[in-house]
């Protein structure tokens, strides 16, 4: 399953690169309104006072039907708004919040993310096979 991500300041991009997951796509201003026709896990940062970035909002308006899970980055200095974009997306689109990580994530966060994506993919593939 593809990992789709948005990186406002480069932190999420660095996190994804460190994860060494190869099946990825970056959301940009240029492609945020393009249709995306396959299941994906979304990774996004949080901006302002816990908001979902506009590019991610635009992407989800068109492509929410293929969203399977979300992970979010943030800064703990924002207290209850830490990585709030992930919780907002999870609640709005009824998908699991895989994890929250600070800024570009620690090595432990990267390992946790890879493991969760791997388990999520295994379960998704199993469900897909059982539906045939």
Swiss-Prot record:
GO biological process, one term: protein modification process
Domain of life: Bacteria
Pfam families hit by this protein: Flavodoxin_NdrI
Molecular functions (GO terms): FMN binding
Gene3D superfamilies assigned to the protein according to its UniProt record, in alphabetical order: 3.40.50.360
Family assignment from sequence similarity: Belongs to the NrdI family.
Role according to the record: Probably involved in ribonucleotide reductase function.
Xref: PANTHER family: PROTEIN NRDI
Protein name: Protein NrdI
Organism encoding this protein: Staphylococcus haemolyticus (strain JCSC1435)
Gene responsible for this protein: nrdI
